[in-house]
Amino acid sequence: MSLITNLYGDPKALRPIGPWCADAAKNNDGKYTYTGNRTNWALVINGVTRGCVVAVDFSTSRRDAFGLEGCQVIYKSSTTLAGVYKSTGNCSLYCSGGEGVSATVNRIGLYSQDDWKRLQQYGLDWFDGDLMPRQN
């Protein structure tokens, strides 16, 4: 048996993500809510390697305004947005047309493409621990 690895250092999103043109406020549950103070704003996700899958689980009333900068989106659900990082620039949760729009980041995953495929095979779009056993 091998392991599925979440490569992101803060999978439960308990530390603030680098806001650009947004304010961050810590909630009672330890998560952060970000509110844009410009029309376009972003949460820059550091440590993403080209070719990896980044998955962001977030809550917002304006899901239509969000995308993943520097990524080819490969998955969308009512809570999760995932994409393959294919750039050398920013990897961010990007909000367009969102002055005053808020988002709470609940979890972040960073996976190899093979591990992401295995998660999908298990019927999962998410896993926020460090390691998870997987069938070979």
Stretches with model-predicted labels:
Residues 1-4, 14, 42-45, 70-71:
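Low-complexity, intrinsically disordered short peptide segments enriched in small/polar/basic residues
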Residues 22-26, 71-73:
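Short secondary-structure junctions
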